[in-house]
């Protein structure tokens, strides 16, 4: 279940229910028996569901999240660009814009999964 609520500032935010988070985690990690397979499962979910590119701010600077990458250490990163500059930022640390892009609930599920391992 996805819930939409209003913050004190009147902005809406979407929260995913625990049952839906569990379903998403299961979908991303089904048949994944090691860290490499789990990372590949999550990466696949982002490729299928996350609408790219999208704009956000990193340290107060506007950037474009152009793509998602998978590092050799199995860390999933957002490839952020600004002009000719590129920077990989962990999805765990990536600030999401408001409103969030379509598919951003997969980032929330990924963060939840990482916190529970």
Identify the function of each model-found stretch.
Residues 2-53:
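Mixed-charge, Lys/Arg-rich low-complexity intrinsically disordered regions
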Residues 3-5, 15, 75, 112-117:
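Short beta-rich binding modules
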Residues 7-10, 28-31, 104-117:
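Long, low-complexity intrinsically disordered regions
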Residues 54-58:
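A short beta-strand micro-motif
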Residues 61-69:
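Short beta-strand-centered aromatic/proline hotspots
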